[in-house]
Regions:
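PLD/PLD-like phosphodiesterase catalytic module centered on the HKD motif
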Residues: 203-351
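A short beta-strand element within the Helicase C-terminal
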Residues: 118-119, 127-142, 151, 167-170, ...
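Conserved helicase ATPase core of P-loop NTP-dependent helicases/translocases
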Residues: 75-76, 86-125
Length: 351
């Protein structure tokens, strides 16, 4: 069903909560997806972050389902949740028909007032799985296909007495380029099913909520943030490339003249860097940069796959977050590599 029409007929809101992890590869970044997932699933700090969030949800009276792609991860997370819920049910696609039947019978017989957590593989809760009590989804391992997002989120969208808000917790491993890219792709999936998007009834205040915008809707909110800027702006993008200079160039020039610190980081050079140099703005090149974002006053973060200084596809998305800790983490990532070099700055061209 169309997300907006479905939401109009439901009493609960849909909330996306991104959780940025500290996980990073110790060895080479050139690992396959399978290798990365295997390593991530065994990371103690990351698993503890997930379990702490699940625990809080249970304390709030919520009914969580934790999704992962590995059977071993299901077992480990379920074991960690046991102290916090009266019932912890595991659902694994590889289980026998008998095991699946027993698990579903257990679910059907759990009183709605008893605390419950489900830990499952994504394949298990595809089409056909129905448990209306669920109101909180924890995406414990990265995926990118938006069809999976719609399918998984759909498990939360069944009407149930007392359901006022459904949440999805997404664990984003921003220090792993492949995982960072996959999360940016997931934003499109979340937007398509009504998570973190602007309300059509006009009631949403985009300066207070964390929202997902597309290439046609982000500019009003982004420029309002720039008007309120007090100290600094860091932009990270793939390249500075356009046919006509965007409004942002003149806006950056005005901010610079008002004493705002500005730095633009790029992955590819050889396009329109000189326009920013002429405006007096530092441009810093780093050939392994993967993150696309804008960080305002080290607290407001615009993060996604929209290039603020270049071309964008119609279905590009960006998410606005107000979180100083995440903003600081991204600044550390952007500045951490010694291979960066300043191409242009306010006093001279091509350093």
């Amino acid at each position: 069903a169309d997300a907006q029409s479905q939401m109009n007929n439901q009493s609960f809101s849909r909330i996306l909560i991104p959780r940025f992890t500290t996980f990073r590869n110790i060895s080479s970044d050139d690992k396959t997806y399978t290798q990365i997932v295997e390593t991530i699933s065994k990371d103690e700090a990351r698993n503890r972050l997930i379990i702490d969030d699940v625990h809080k949800a249970i304390v709030e009276g919520r009914t969580p389902i934790v999704l992962t792609s590995l059977t071993s991860h299901v077992r480990e997370l379920a074991e960690m949740i046991l102290p916090y819920a009266k019932h912890v049910i595991t659902l694994i696609g590889a289980d026998s028909i008998k095991e699946k039947r027993i698990a579903m019978e257990r679910l059907r017989n759990i009183p709605p007032t008893d605390s419950l957590a489900i830990v499952a593989t994504g394949k298990y809760i595809g089409e056909g799985f129905d448990y209306p009590r669920l109101d909180t989804l924890f995406l414990a391992l990265p995926i990118s296909w938006k069809g999976n997002i719609a399918q998984y989120a759909g498990r939360l969208h069944r009407n149930f007495e007392g359901k006022k808000e459904v949440r999805i917790y997404d664990y984003v491993d921003i220090r792993v380029p492949l995982c960072d890219t996959m999360y940016r792709k997931r934003l499109k999936g979340y937007a398509s099913v009504g998570y973190g998007t602007i309300s059509t009834n006009g009631k949403t205040d985009f300066l207070k909520k964390e929202l997902i915008f597309d290439s046609n809707t982000y500019k009003v909110a982004f420029y309002q943030d720039l008007i309120g800027i007090k100290q600094s702006l860091v932009i990270s993008c793939q390249r500075i490339k356009y046919k006509y200079p965007p409004r942002l160039i003149s806006q950056l020039r005005d901010l610079l003249h008002n004493g705002i610190e500005i730095a633009v980081h790029i992955k590819e050079q050889g396009y329109n860097e000189k326009d920013l140099a002429d405006a007096g703005i530092d441009v810093i090149y780093r050939n392994d940069l993967s993150i696309q974002c804008a960080i305002i006053d080290k607290s407001i973060l615009w993060y996604g796959n929209i290039n603020l200084l270049g071309y964008n596809a119609e279905d590009s998305n960006v998410m606005r977050l107000c979180d100083p800790s995440i903003a600081t983490e991204l600044i550390d990532i952007i500045y951490e590599d010694n291979s960066k070099q300043i191409l242009y700055n306010s006093s001279k061209n091509l350093v």
